[in-house]
């Protein structure tokens, strides 16, 4: 549940969200998320990771122009620890 609403996530989205939410406020590297989602031998381009994060943001109602839930850093992504989001 997010903001008291049930949100349907794909398996990849749920895996990424769990990992990001595990360490709020800290960067999770792109490499770590790619390995977690697709395995060490996964030949996944960074663009596919970005696509999955965009989809996850959209489902969470996060504004891609000014994200407040999943932030982008140079090396990866950060889950913002925001109590008002209801997480």
Q: Residue ranges of each PLM-predicted region?
A:
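Hydrophobic residues on short alpha-helical segments
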Residues: 17-18, 34
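Acidic-residue sensor for enzyme active/binding pockets
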Residues: 13, 46, 54
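Short, positively charged loop/turn segments that connect secondary-structure elements
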Residues: 39-48
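DNA-binding patch around the recognition helix
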Residues: 8, 51-87
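A structural micro-motif at secondary-structure boundaries
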Residues: 2-15, 27, 43, 78-87
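Short coil-to-helix segment of the ABC ATPase nucleotide-binding domain corresponding to the Q-loop/switch region
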Residues: 25-37
């Amino acid at each position: 549940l997010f903001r008291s609403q049930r949100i349907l996530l794909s398996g990849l989205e749920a895996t990424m969200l769990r990992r990001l939410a595990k360490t709020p406020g800290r960067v999770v590297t792109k490499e770590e998320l790619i390995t977690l989602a697709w395995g060490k031998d996964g030949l996944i381009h960074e663009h596919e990771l970005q696509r999955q994060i965009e989809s996850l943001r959209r489902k969470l109602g996060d504004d891609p122009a000014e994200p407040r839930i999943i932030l982008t850093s140079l090396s990866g992504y950060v889950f913002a620890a925001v109590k008002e989001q209801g997480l």
